[in-house]
Amino acid sequence: MANNYGNAGYNGPTNGPYGNAGYNGANGPYGNNSVHQGQPHTDQNGVPILHYGNGGYNGPQAQYGNAGQNQPSGPFGGAGYTGPTAGTGFGNAGYTPSPPAGVPGNGFVPGGVDVHDDHHHDGHHKKHGRKEHDHHHGHHHGHHHKH
């Protein structure tokens, strides 16, 4: 069963209005369901519109949709034929099965990013001040001077 913002899978049924239904399914008004055609919709000036749909089997992904066969996913979609899930609540994977309920999808990394531990520079900051620290910072590691 597909949700309103994701992909229904390889041969899945039609899904909600903002996603793609999968390899052989029909799609909603903002998606593409073509196997080989990933062309975007265009506005009155011919400018591509790829905000809420899928790029198709081999097409590029959209910002809020699902990617093509081997393409990376957008931030709110699943990945497609063989790619990992986006790890969000707005999509599912496609041809490959989704993870069990409660398990993050592939590509979802819990926690934050590593932050450089700068506590050993405290004395350096106090002695030289911020402006001088900026000048010397690149040379500080690897050798230490008596102050």
Swiss-Prot record:
Organism of this sequence: Caenorhabditis elegans
Biased composition (Polar residues): 34-45, 60-73
The protein, known as: Uncharacterized protein F53A9.9
Biased composition (Gly residues): 75-92
Region spans: Disordered: 29-147
Biased amino acid composition, Basic residues: 122-147
